[in-house]
């Protein structure tokens, strides 16, 4: 009896698990727990017979003085625990690195060709066939090594053990895997593999476990690390990552089905349902228009607001997709109107948005993948609006706040710095504007929250919470205005109320001509004070939201409001356009808000 193997866990395997758990604990979702538990179960079930055979046939062994002595099918308890702890750690690294990803667009495969050269673009089906041949070759090689026996035995057992899993997974999920960002796969494979190589080297040198001579090829990657051991840790991490990616593939299929529906809301899939989707439903059942448009919406969100993109990761499934689709419409409409070369073109786009909304809500009873409804919608509106309007979850949203949003854009159109026209004259004007361009979006967000996660509160209470949400949106808009004084002045707009400017001896025209005037600093602070008051006033309302979205809403708003604190800390950088909130600061803010 000994404690060597147990101490390997205590020193090297459990500490990373604890650290990863502490880092990720506030963000854990029920579905992620399901995924990890399921994968750990599969790891134990698949590995136990194989490992037991290796021990019984003396491919490897454990000295009596390195293990406590209790076994399961001749496998030391410490080894059985390793199946679980490795799967847990690798799965959690994968989840950490991929939390930000919106899975749905990856069902369509890679956006850009993976290989272009002398033979042209390699088709996705060619990659599928190549993968099948490759993993079949691994299986054949493994069987050949086993038949040869001797020094090739351990290598053959590893290859023949992994190949059935890879052959099963690849044809069903190759498109999804090839669509994912490469780093989302190789980082969760490489990091734990390198770490375990180091741990294994130390254990082999100490004799904690032994690969018997005559069953290995006697090639070492470095002193103390046998080729077979290095391969074992690499392929086990590959299987874990592909396993959890396979579950993400099934989740994406489930989310697609819910997203295009007009009735499904707030569901969390069970593991049996995900397995059914994985084995029976493929990307062929997904509408290419929906996948393409969601990919465009995600790209737009990442380009325009990293804070909102990362904030959206706090939400789950269909609700997150609905929020991305909502943001896509708001952002696209804003860009078309703001980037218009003249006032007439801007007015044209406002009218087109109104027309598109009217038609979209008339068709709200049709599923998103309804071809006839899609054709009816797209033939009646400009191509620039097709994706943004089509994706809108109209069956789950009221139309009123979206119409009010367009009124905010109409206020923007009233600015005319050459003629000295600035519509934000009073603090009331500022509040009205902030409601139209941001309070409406917060209202729509809460409408989606209550639709996906109904709670038993009275209509009056629900309206009170939504009204407080309008204040939450205004708080974010006041922060935006404080941040963008210089940028807004460059396009002839001043959102600081004229009466505030007059108190400092300024006019809007003076701000346009000199947006870095030091006299604006106290006014910017005043905007931030107003934002923080609105934010504080919403805290009680946030606490009344459904439990599973309360923390995500608080985290998203808190992280965005931290921009105001960064502005206060870096006032000169704001003038020079160098303001940037670090990812670590955003993560820290979200972690504290979610805890």
Curated annotation (Swiss-Prot):
Which SUPFAM superfamilies does the entry mention? Terpenoid synthases
Give this protein's Gene Ontology molecular function annotations. Answer: geranylgeranyl diphosphate synthase activity; intramolecular lyase activity; lycopene beta cyclase activity; squalene synthase [NAD(P)H] activity
Pfam families cross-referenced by the UniProt entry: SQS_PSY
Q: Which InterPro entries match?
A: Isoprenoid_synthase_dom_sf, Lycopene_cyclase_dom, Squ/phyt_synthse, Squalene/phytoene_synthase_CS, Trans_IPPS_bact-type, Trans_IPPS_HH
> Which CDD domains does this entry report, sorted A to Z?
Trans_IPPS_HH
Q: Which PROSITE patterns match?
A: SQUALEN_PHYTOEN_SYN_2
What is catalysed by this protein?
all-trans-lycopene = gamma-carotene; gamma-carotene = all-trans-beta-carotene; 2 (2E,6E,10E)-geranylgeranyl diphosphate = 15-cis-phytoene + 2 diphosphate
What residue ranges are annotated as transmembrane?
3-23, 35-55, 77-97, 130-150, 153-173, 176-196, 231-251
Sequence segments annotated as region (Lycopene beta-cyclase): 1-249
Give me the ranges of the annotated region Phytoene synthase.
256-595
Q: Which family does this protein fall into? A: In the N-terminal section; belongs to the lycopene beta-cyclase family. In the C-terminal section; belongs to the phytoene/squalene synthase family.
What is this protein's function per UniProt?
A: Bifunctional enzyme that catalyzes the reactions from geranylgeranyl diphosphate to phytoene (phytoene synthase) and lycopene to beta-carotene via the intermediate gamma-carotene (lycopene cyclase).
This protein is called Bifunctional lycopene cyclase/phytoene synthase
What is the native source organism of this protein? Trichophyton verrucosum (strain HKI 0517)
């Amino acid at each position: 009896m000994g404690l060597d193997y147990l101490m390997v866990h205590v020193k090297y395997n459990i500490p990373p698990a604890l650290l990863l758990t502490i880092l990720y604990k506030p963000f854990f979702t029920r579905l992620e727990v399901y995924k990890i538990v399921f994968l750990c179960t599969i790891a134990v079930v698949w590995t136990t017979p194989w490992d037991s055979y290796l021990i019984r046939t003396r491919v490897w062994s454990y000295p009596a003085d390195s293990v406590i002595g209790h076994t399961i099918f001749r496998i030391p308890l410490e080894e059985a625990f390793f199946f679980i702890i490795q799967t847990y750690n690798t799965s959690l690294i994968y989840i950490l690195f991929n939390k930000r990803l919106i899975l749905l667009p990856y069902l369509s495969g890679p956006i850009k060709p993976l290989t272009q050269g002398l033979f042209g673009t390699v088709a996705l089906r060619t990659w599928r066939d190549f993968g099948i041949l490759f993993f079949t070759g691994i299986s054949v090689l493994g069987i050949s090594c086993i038949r040869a026996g001797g020094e090739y035995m351990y290598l053959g057992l590893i290859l023949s053990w992994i190949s059935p899993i890879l052959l099963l997974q690849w044809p069903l999920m190759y498109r999804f895997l090839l669509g994912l960002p490469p780093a989302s796969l190789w980082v969760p494979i490489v990091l734990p593999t390198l770490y375990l190589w180091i741990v294994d080297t130390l254990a082999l040198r100490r004799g904690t476990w032994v690969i018997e001579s005559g069953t290995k090829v006697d090639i070492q990657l470095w002193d103390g690390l046998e080729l077979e051991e290095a391969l074992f840790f690499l392929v086990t991490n590959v299987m874990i990552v592909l396993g959890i990616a396979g579950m993400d593939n099934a989740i994406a299929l489930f989310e697609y089905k819910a997203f295009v529906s007009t009735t499904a809301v707030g569901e969390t899939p069970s593991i049996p349902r995900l397995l059914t989707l994985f084995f029976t439903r493929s990307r062929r059942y997904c509408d290419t228009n929906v996948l393409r448009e969601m990919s465009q919406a995600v790209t737009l969100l990442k380009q325009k607001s990293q804070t909102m993109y990362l904030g959206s990761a706090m939400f789950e499934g269909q609700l997150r997709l609905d929020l991305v689709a909502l943001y896509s419409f708001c952002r696209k409409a804003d860009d078309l109107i703001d980037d218009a070369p003249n006032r007439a073109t801007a007015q044209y786009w406002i009218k087109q948005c109104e027309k598109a909304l009217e038609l979209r809500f008339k068709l709200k009873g049709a599923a998103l993948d309804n071809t006839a409804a899609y054709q009816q919608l797209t033939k009646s509106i400009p191509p620039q609006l097709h994706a943004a309007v089509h994706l809108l979850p109209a069956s789950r949203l009221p139309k009123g706040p979206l119409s009010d949003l367009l009124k905010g854009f109409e206020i923007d159109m009233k600015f005319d710095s050459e003629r000295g026209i600035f519509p934000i004259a009073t603090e009331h004007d500022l509040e009205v504007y902030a409601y139209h361009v941001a309070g409406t979006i917060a209202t729509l967000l809460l409408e989606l929250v209550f639709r996906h996660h109904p709670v038993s509160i009275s209509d009056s209470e629900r309206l009170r919470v939504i009204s407080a949400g309008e204040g939450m949106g205004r708080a974010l808009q006041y922060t935006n205005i404080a941040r963008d004084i210089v940028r807004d002045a460059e396009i002839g707009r001043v959102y600081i109320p004229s009466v505030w400017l007059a108190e400092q001896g300024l006019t809007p025209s003076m701000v346009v001509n000199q947006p870095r005037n030091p006299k604006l600093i106290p006014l910017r602070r005043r905007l931030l004070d107003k934002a923080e008051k609105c934010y504080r006033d919403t805290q009680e309302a946030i606490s009344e939201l459904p439990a599973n979205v309360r923390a995500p809403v608080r985290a998203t708003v808190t992280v965005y409001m931290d921009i105001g604190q960064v502005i206060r800390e870096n006032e000169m950088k704001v003038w020079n356009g160098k303001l940037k909130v670090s990812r670590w600061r955003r993560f820290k803010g979200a972690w504290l808000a979610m805890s």
